[in-house]
Amino acid sequence: MEKEILLLLLVIMFLTVADVDAVRVPFCATKSAKDSIFGLRDQTCSVSGVESDERPRFVAVTEGDERWLQIALDMIHKNKCDYVALLFYASWCPFSRSFRPSFDVISSLYSSIPHFAIKESSIKPSTLSKYGVHGFPTLLLLNSTMRARYRGTRMLDSLVAFYSDVTGIETLDKTSLERSVSVPHLGNENNTEPENCPFTWARSPENMLRQETYLALAIVFVLLRLLHLIYPTLVVFMKFTWRRIAQNMRLESLLEHTVGFLSRAVQLCMHRRSNLQGGAMNARAWASKSLATVSIGDSSSSNRRSSSSQ
C-alpha cells in the first residue's frame, strides 16, 4: 500500500513539472532606450531556446559622425553584423553629390549590411588618414578581419559587382535590380577612372587650423625648429652674398670711373690736336704774309737805284 502511494506521488510530481514546461511562454527581451533610438539591436530573439539565423535588416543610410563611426566598429567587433559599409563624402564635392543616390540604392539592395554616410565636416582629418581616405567620395566595406575600398565608377552595376565580390552576398534578381530606383549618372560612363575631390584643409589652411589645431601647432613647431637649426648657415650665406654684391658694386664703380677718365683723356687729346692744327695754319698764313712784304720791299729798292743812276 505504501509503495502504491509513493508511486502515485511520483507520477503526480512528474505531470506537474511537464505542465509547467508546457505552459512556459517564450518572450523577447525589451529594447532599451539606446537601442530604440539608435536602432542597432538585433531584430531577432531566441524562442524556446532556438536562436533564429535571420540577420537584422537595415533599410536606410545612417548619417553620422565620429561617434557613429565608433558604433559601426562596435557592431563589427560584437558580431552584430558581418559587414559594415562606410561612405566618406563632402557636401561641396560634386562627385559626392552624384554618388550618393547610388549609395542609397545599394543600401536597399543589401539591407543586411548597415550603411553609414560620414560627412567630411563632422570628422577629423586624422581619422580620415587613419582609414586611408585621401579624397571624396570614398566607400569602404569592413568586417572583423579586412577592409575593402571601392575604386570603380558611380554606376550601380559596378557597385553590385563590388559588393558581391567582397561579401559573397547575392543581391536581388536581375528583374528586381532593373525595377529598382533609377540612379542618375553624371559625366562620361565609359570613364573608369575613380573621381574624387581633395580635402578642404588641403585647399584652405584655415580649415586645418580650425579642425586640427594640435597638428597645425606641431607643424609650426617643426618649421621653427628647422629654422633655428639652419639659421647660422643662413647668416653665413647672407654675409657671403653681401660681400659678393659689394665687391661687384666696387668693380662696377671702378670701371665706370676708368671709362670716364679715358673719355676725358680722349677729349683732351682731340682738343690739343685741333689747337696744333690751328696754330700750324696760322703760322703758314703769317709766313706767306712775311714773304709778300719782303718781295714788295725788294722791288721798290731796285727801282730807286735805277732812277738814281740815270
UniProtKB/Swiss-Prot annotation:
Compartments (UniProt record): Membrane
Alphabetically ordered keywords of this record: Glycoprotein, Membrane, Signal, Transmembrane, Transmembrane helix
Signal peptide extent: 1-22
Membrane topology (UniProt): Single-pass membrane protein
Transmembrane stretches, start-end: 217-237
Glycosylation sites (chain numbering): N143, N190
Top-level taxon: Eukaryota
Residue span, Thioredoxin domain: 49-168
GO cellular component: membrane
Stored InterPro entries: APRL4/6 (IPR044606), Thioredoxin-like_sf (IPR036249), Thioredoxin_domain (IPR013766)
Protein known as: 5'-adenylylsulfate reductase-like 4
Organism this protein belongs to: Arabidopsis thaliana
